[in-house]
């Protein structure tokens, strides 16, 4: 028995509601789907993007932010999105280095995309990811759990608060909940 296999990439808004879906009969992975299907469509359809003048006036302002899981981790891709489109990327750090001292973490109020405010122990640093050619500086935010585990996220949303980044990435679970109850 042979069946056609496809991969669906769901693009959701900040509240986890579906914006659109890309079906790929031949799939070469998330990064290729982002480059060829998702980003071109977002550039056309995302409302309220900054003007060219606004982007020129503020070197840290992004056109919009895309958030994805570890499969999309690629310093070269982050650099490409920022250089070519001024799109910021937020994802989990696939290769975090050693744990940070617990003294760097502070109890922080994080507003999730649905408006819920949660208390999290967070710390932030600038970090270099990738190699000399394709690497770049990113904002790294870590969440400290009660067990001492550190969850690391990285962001090229340079002009935003780390708390916003943390809330956005941690809210990504609303997508999984959407599919669970769909």
Language-model-detected regions and their locations in the chain:
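Conserved aromatic-histidine-acidic binding/catalytic patches
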Residues: 26, 65-69, 166-170
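Short acidic, S/G/P-rich loop/turn micro-motifs used as interaction or catalytic elements
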Residues: 26-29, 71-75, 160
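Acidic, metal-coordinating catalytic cores used for nucleic-acid/nucleotide bond scission
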Residues: 67-75, 95-98
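An anionic, glycine-rich sequence signature occurring as long contiguous blocks
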Residues: 20, 79, 83-178
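Short, conserved catalytic/metal-binding motifs centered on acidic residues
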Residues: 1, 16, 63-72, 89, ...
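Electropositive, glycine- and tryptophan-enriched low-complexity nucleic-acid-binding patches
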Residues: 2-56, 149-152
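Extended, regular secondary-structure scaffolds
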Residues: 14, 36, 40, 44-47, ...
């Amino acid at each position: 028995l042979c069946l056609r296999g496809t991969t669906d990439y769901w693009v959701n808004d900040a509240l986890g509601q579906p914006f659109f879906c890309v079906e790929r009969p031949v799939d070469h992975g998330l990064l290729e789907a982002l480059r060829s299907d998702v980003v071109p469509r977002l550039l056309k359809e995302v409302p309220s993007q900054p003007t060219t003048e606004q982007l020129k006036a503020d070197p840290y302002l992004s056109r919009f932010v895309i958030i994805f899981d570890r499969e999309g981790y690629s310093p070269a891709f982050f650099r490409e999105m920022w250089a070519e489109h001024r799109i910021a990327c937020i994802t989990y750090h696939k290769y975090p280095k050693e744990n940070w001292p617990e003294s760097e973490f502070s109890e922080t109020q994080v507003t999730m995309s649905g408006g819920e405010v949660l208390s999290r122990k967070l710390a932030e640093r600038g970090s270099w990811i990738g190699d000399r050619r394709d690497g770049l500086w990113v904002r790294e935010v870590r969440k400290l759990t009660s067990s001492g585990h550190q969850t690391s996220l990285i962001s090229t949303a340079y002009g935003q608060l780390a708390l916003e980044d943390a809330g956005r990435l941690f809210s990504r679970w609303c997508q999984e909940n959407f599919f669970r109850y769909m």
